[in-house]
């Protein structure tokens, strides 16, 4: 009898402990949710937003990769200047000024509560964004306006029908706003209204799906059943992503085909080592041994990963792929080559990371237009 009572008490205590643990997991506070989010990434802050890592270049990256940088930049952004952090007189920020903003390894913080929330926890930006680093503003997007201040291509407004962008610039990672609002794609007229209903006909745009409809709002992770909440149980994200993924793969194959057609011209690159984050100039390449490519960005520039027959991979920014070493070498892919604009579009969808969910119509039309533009 005594043993039975002890077993009963033990099981009861175990049950209470499990219940308490379950309740704690189910009712995490905003701070605990944030700790599990990608905004809580001080390692990224140290690499991109400190003077030790970037010198004066931290004025560019710290805008969106640190709490101190964002708060220093926001008044400037609201005043109409979306460029890198500047001094009060408008001149470029230097290392002493950035150090005074605490953009150092010792003090720089990731995107914390006070980056997004001001007094009384009011959001610092709502409803309509100022002119964004991507070169446009988003109007009447509710609380999602705050997200959009950073989650955009951050490299100025492109001209959709230009025949020569005169640069190899890539979209910045987390380029969701451009896709949601239907902007900054080559080969597709983006001067009209191509915004997604998810951005302009859903209250608070980003916040609705990534916070309001989730069990852990400050994790910023959209719930797996979000699509079904509005569109019915048969509609999942995969339901939308499958055809877009196919088009995205076709675009990569079309770009790869153009590279392989001229691979024998490729003899020299400035190779990037992703493990060390260093560049080596005038690296000889036997173009005949290139079997394929991947497409990414390094240092804000479109980058091809050349896949070699021996299994090696060589990273090179597109403007550093040449037909001869040194200054006499000519770039194999000039900025006017359609492959440059096609690669921008490919990366735009890659870095949006929704594979069509954010704006299926714009994404499909843009990918099809890009495929048609590649002879």
Question: Where are the predicted features?
Answer:
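Sequence context of c-type cytochrome heme-c attachment sites
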Residues: 19-145, 149-220, 349
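Bacterial N-terminal signal peptides
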Residues: 10-18
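Positively charged n-region of N-terminal signal peptides that target proteins for export
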Residues: 1-7
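Cysteine-rich micro-motifs
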Residues: 227-228
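Gly/Gly-Pro-rich "capping" loops immediately C-terminal to redox-active cysteine motifs
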Residues: 76-89, 222-223, 237-254
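Mature extracytoplasmic or organellar-lumen-exposed domains after removal of signal/transit peptides
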Residues: 232, 238-240, 245-375
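Active-site proximal loops enriched in glycine and acidic residues that flank catalytic Cys/His/Asp
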Residues: 210, 231-234
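Internal amphipathic alpha-helical segments of the cytochrome P450 catalytic fold
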Residues: 31, 236-237
């Amino acid at each position: 009898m005594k043993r039975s009572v002890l077993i009963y008490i033990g099981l009861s205590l175990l049950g209470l402990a499990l219940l308490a643990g379950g309740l704690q997991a189910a009712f995490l506070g905003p701070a605990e949710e944030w700790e599990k989010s990608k905004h809580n990434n001080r390692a990224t802050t140290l690499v991109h937003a400190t003077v030790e890592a970037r010198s004066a270049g931290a004025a560019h990256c710290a805008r969106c990769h640190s709490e101190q940088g964002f708060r220093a930049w926001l008044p400037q952004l609201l005043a109409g200047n979306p460029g890198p952090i500047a001094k009060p007189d408008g001149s470029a920020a230097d290392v002493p000024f950035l150090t005074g903003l605490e953009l150092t390894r010792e003090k720089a913080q990731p995107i914390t509560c006070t980056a997004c929330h001001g007094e009384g926890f009011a959001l610092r930006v709502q409803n309509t964004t100022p002119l964004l680093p991507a070169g446009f503003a988003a109007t009447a997007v509710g609380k999602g306006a705050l997200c959009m201040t950073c989650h955009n291509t951050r490299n100025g407004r492109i001209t959709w029908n230009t025949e020569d962008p005169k640069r190899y610039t890539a979209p910045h990672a987390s380029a969701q706003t451009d896709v949601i609002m239907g902007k900054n794609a080559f080969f597709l007229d983006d001067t009209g209204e191509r915004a997604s209903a998810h951005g302009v006909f859903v209250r608070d745009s980003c916040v609705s799906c990534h916070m309001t409809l989730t069990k852990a709002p400050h994790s910023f992770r959209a719930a797996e059943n979000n699509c079904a909440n509005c569109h019915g149980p048969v509609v999942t994200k995969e339901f939308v992503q499958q055809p877009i993924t196919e088009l995205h793969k076709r675009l990569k194959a079309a770009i790869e085909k153009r590279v392989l057609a001229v691979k024998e011209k490729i003899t020299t690159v400035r190779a990037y080592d992703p493990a060390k984050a260093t560049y080596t100039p005038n690296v000889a390449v036997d173009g005949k041994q290139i079997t394929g490519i991947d497409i990414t960005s390094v240092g804000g520039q479109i980058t091809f990963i050349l896949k070699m027959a021996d299994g090696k991979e060589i990273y090179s920014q597109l403007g550093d792929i040449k037909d001869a070493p040194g200054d006499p070498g000519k770039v194999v892919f000039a900025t006017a080559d359609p492959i440059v604009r096609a690669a921008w579009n490919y990366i735009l969808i890659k870095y949006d990371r929704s594979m069509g969910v954010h704006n299926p119509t714009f994404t499909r039309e843009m990918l099809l237009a890009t495929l048609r533009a590649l002879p």
